[in-house]
Amino acid sequence: MPTENVHGDSRLSLWLRVREYAVPASMIETATARRSAGDWAGACAAAGVDVDLDLRFLARSRGSELAARIRADLRHLAPDLLRWHLPRIAPDGLLRPGLTSTLARYDTAAGDDPHAVHTVHLVARTAPAWADGGQRISLALWDGSRSGQGRWGNPRHGPRPDRRFRLDLHRHLWDARRTDELRVRSGADRPPAEVLPPLDPELLAAPPQGHRCAVDRWAAEAGILLRAEGRTTGSVAVRLGARQRLVLDLAADGPGPPAARIGAAPADGSASALPVLPDAAVWTLPDLDLIRTGAVEAGRLHPLVASALVPDHAPTGPAGTADRAGQPRLVECRGARHRIGLVDGVLAALDHDPAEIRREELLAALTGTPLPCLRAIDAAHRRPDCLTGVRERLDHGDVAGALTVVEGLLGPDALLRAGALRDELEAAALRRITYGLFRAGLAGPGPGRIHPGAHRPREHRPHPRQAHAR
């Protein structure tokens, strides 16, 4: 059956997997508890966020006022929510690699000139694709200078923030104080069947076929962007992909709010200088689509997202299924139904005596055919049914979740055998090592550095080929 028939479209299929694996409930719970206790650094650690800034050094070098403003924002940063909303790419829904996204901007006086303004950015960064093991995020400061503090101060690893993926105008996507704004900014405050205000027909026809663009919100979001630039009307650029862009003109027509229309691209090539509508404002919020199509229940979303999109939703704690870890499983063995289960921390055949097991293992070592129970145990070690879920968790950095699944199947004392499962765990460990070398400046393009290894293979992934990422 086509993906479109199962999940509405391939985009929803992609986001279903992302919401299931990318930000596990255990991460949300731990990060929330630490943030609520005032431990913002601990919350970042729980959410897989590396902190590459030193507030004490900042206070000495730039002044205590700037450091206090940044500290206030960090105390309310929900790093798990930031991970939830950061841009992702198809086909696996991983974080967009090599991204530098502005979370907040701080204007400070530059030197002795009271009229000169210097802007410091609080940014979130993702590693390049070849070093994305663990899907970790970094927090840093960027001020446009070639000097800086911490690992990311190096210009090679500290690129200019991407205007397309800025989040300083969308603080509700990471600031716990403003998450209620998500309902209005996503359009969730309007019923799906509500008649939209009249829009320019050319504007409605502009998005590519099959893309879920928030066209009805573009005028309001363009207004927010222009006001941040000190204007109320003007033109903004909208990027719909790598090869499709359009110019949106926001003009006042009468006493109402400014209306948006498709504008002509500047003939002098100045389109690149136009303000860029943030990517978070271009597309329909995936969580809203998932809820409205019935693909997920509010309880499976991030609690801050669920409370904003579905205000009458009562949090019931982490959703889960009955825990079958360690429960015996049935195997058809020589005309009978036998059990295999955990004994002393390893997976074993429960309905065969030890002497028979030793005899069958010796037979298998001599190239014979072992008992079906032993074949089932061997298959569980090499290529278990849960392999896809383990792989997804490892790819998204949830090593603890992946090991919990493996230990629930094979036992905590199991010795993994050669096969796909061990290969996936070893590959994940190597990717984490590569990330550590990158963080230390010991791997990456350049003389004297270890050349990046090949990226993880994709051919084994049964993902929709036409999946789209926000």
Where are these regions (language model features)?
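Ordered hydrophobic segments in well-structured contexts
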Residues: R96-R105, H118-V123, R136-A140, S235-A237, ...
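N-terminal membrane-targeting/anchoring modules of bacterial envelope and secretion proteins
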Residues: M1-Q209, A214-D216, L410, L415-R470
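Extended acidic, Ser/Thr- and Pro-enriched interaction/regulatory segments
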Residues: R160, R164-R166, H170-A273, A281-V282
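C-terminal structured domains
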Residues: R239-R470
